[in-house]
């Protein structure tokens, strides 16, 4: 079995994928051992840094069929996915990440997701703020995926985002089989939003999914100051664990106007939701097991908990 080790020392260029301001076709990995690290502001596997003029994209997406793949993003770059960019209309992203087999470990750089969106950052040299944030489509059919977000990034989903008025979205995760373990960096959800990010959509019909949020974030759903998004479970086993003030499945801690619970529908499978516990030295009871993060009930009397729908024959 062959081995490929790539470390890109050029800012803005991915380890495997596109350079800054450039597009690439689909990336297909069938086997072997790969240890890939992206340059600063770029993904380990996926897109390089975006520019103000040109979107940077992996057209078609990243496909992994087997092998042992370890992907690490540079600062503000996802392990697998996108990098940073400075124009919301010209993003750095991939059309999707599709895993059919193998053992995949993806670690986001500072402010970025393990799998999904790159992270926001501020360049002191140019005095410009660069965005990241948005997750992508991730489909898991088999194999093992372990994803770790960088600080303020989700394990799977969105990286950190600068804007408090416009939240980043966690993208869409579809799990049909295999095993998924996702851990958010500080203030990022295990699966869903990074800091200031909403949860996106999670659909699970098979396999095993385990997700743990970083500080004040949901296991599955919103990062700190993020809404819960949509979660649909029809099969498999799902475990979501919030940290400190984050919900197990739902919203993160609220300090602005977000962190609502989102919409959760369970028609089959096994779901385990564990609320975040009290943060040492701070008075609170933590977030909901399924619902909103801590802080919403005191500040917002609207429909904060979201919805929970269960099939008629589903046993709680």
Predicted regions and their residues:
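Surface-exposed loop/turn motifs in large extracellular/passenger domains
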Residues: 1-8, 16-38, 47-73, 82-108, ...
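Helix-turn-helix-like N-terminal two-helix hairpins of bacterial/phage DNA-binding regulators
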Residues: 44, 77-79, 113-114, 155, ...
């Amino acid at each position: 079995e062959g081995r490929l080790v790539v470390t890109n020392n050029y800012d803005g260029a991915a380890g495997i994928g596109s350079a800054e301001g450039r597009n690439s076709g689909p990336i297909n990995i069938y086997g072997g051992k790969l240890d890939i690290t992206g340059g600063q502001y770029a993904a380990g596997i996926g897109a390089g840094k975006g520019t103000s003029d040109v979107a940077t994209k992996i057209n078609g997406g990243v496909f992994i069929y087997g092998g042992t793949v370890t992907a690490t993003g540079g600062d503000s770059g996802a392990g697998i996915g996108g990098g940073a960019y400075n124009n919301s209309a010209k993003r750095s992203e991939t059309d999707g990440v599709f895993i059919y087999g193998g053992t995949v470990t993806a670690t986001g750089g500072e402010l970025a997701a393990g799998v999904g969106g790159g992270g926001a950052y501020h360049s002191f040299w140019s005095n410009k703020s660069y965005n990241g944030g948005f997750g992508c489509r991730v489909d898991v059919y088999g194999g093992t995926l372990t994803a770790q977000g960088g600080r303020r990034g989700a394990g799977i989903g969105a990286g950190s985002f600068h804007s408090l008025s416009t939240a980043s979205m966690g993208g869409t995760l579809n799990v049909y089989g295999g095993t998924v373990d996702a851990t958010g960096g500080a203030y990022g959800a295990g699966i869903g939003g990074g800091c200031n990010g909403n949860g996106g959509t999670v659909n699970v019909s098979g396999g095993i999914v385990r997700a743990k949020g970083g500080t004040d974030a949901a296991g599955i759903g919103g990062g700190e100051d993020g809404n819960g998004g949509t979660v649909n479970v029809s099969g498999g086993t799902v475990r979501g664990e919030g940290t400190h003030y984050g919900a197990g499945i739902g919203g993160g801690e609220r300090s602005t106007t977000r962190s609502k619970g989102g919409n959760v529908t369970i028609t089959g499978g096994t779901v385990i939701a564990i609320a975040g516990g009290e943060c040492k030295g701070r008075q609170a009871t933590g977030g909901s097991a399924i619902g909103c993060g801590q802080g919403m009930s005191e500040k917002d009397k609207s429909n904060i908990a979201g919805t929970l729908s269960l099939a008629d024959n589903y046993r709680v």
